[in-house]
Amino acid sequence: MLVRMVSTALQIAADRLAALLTGGGGGLADPGGGHLEFDAVVRLRPLTRSVAPPEVWAVDGGQAVVADARCLQLVVARASRTRFCRGVCELEDEGELRAFLLGGKENRAVAVGLGLGIADDAAVDLNLLRDHEEWVAVDRCVEEASAGAMILVDGDLETDWRVPPSWMSGLLARASSRDITVAAVTKRSSLSRGGAPLLGCLEIDAVHELGPRAMWWAPIARSRAGARVVAARLDADAPYAFRVDLSPGADPERALSAMSALCDDAGFPGYPYPLTVADRLAACPGWLRQDTWFEVDDLLDRAGVPHDVRQRAFADRHDLMERF
């Protein structure tokens, strides 16, 4: 019989991983760096589907590196919006594809042009730019949405660390004053229980406590902006539960019951369908990056930049090692 040799380091890591995944308890934490105040006890609660909000907006962002010279980067970011009224999609807005030049002194010029209270000397990267575009789009939705509407956001209700917390608090306060619920859905959550992924633990607990096809929710924490953070399985056929952040003033069970009515699409059970549309609109696939570079290359040519200068500035020399 062939016996596979396992290194000591790998065995130690596997043993530790096994202990974390099967530990069954421990405190809640957010290794992702969120500023959350966790509930003392997390209790699963059954969820019953109601009717979808009459007006639903969804926002998602996209980003891409078009050209990378390491010391300089040409990047693009955008945020897309969609609006559903009584189940009918009435708006698909890809959003403006905004280009930014990053690197060295260029970063300050970019930071100065941003809003959301971002400091002029803030460190700028592509993640911040995408976050900025998304929250600007959410702010527009709050201004345009009708009373009773729900605005869905990809991610959570915590801004990038370079955006002052007061900006998010102000946004959510404006939404609440207009009877608008802002709900953020996180596809990849860093929340943990005893070091193990929290959502996976709750999914297993729910099967034992409520049954394999039960819809459920569980309050978890509050954010520094006052948002209610919960875990929720929003369709009986959903393979996974999600972290959902709900704006202050929203009744969690009522909001989740209404949101679940948006989560019965056969292709994406358990995930709000309007967000899948926004995700598709915001995507920045390879062909888009290539088309954008062709436009930039043409503009550089018109500006008198020689072809060999353009080629050598953005050549991927590491690619030389990956030809074989």
Residue ranges and their predicted role:
Residues 64-109:
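Acidic, metal-ligating active-site segments
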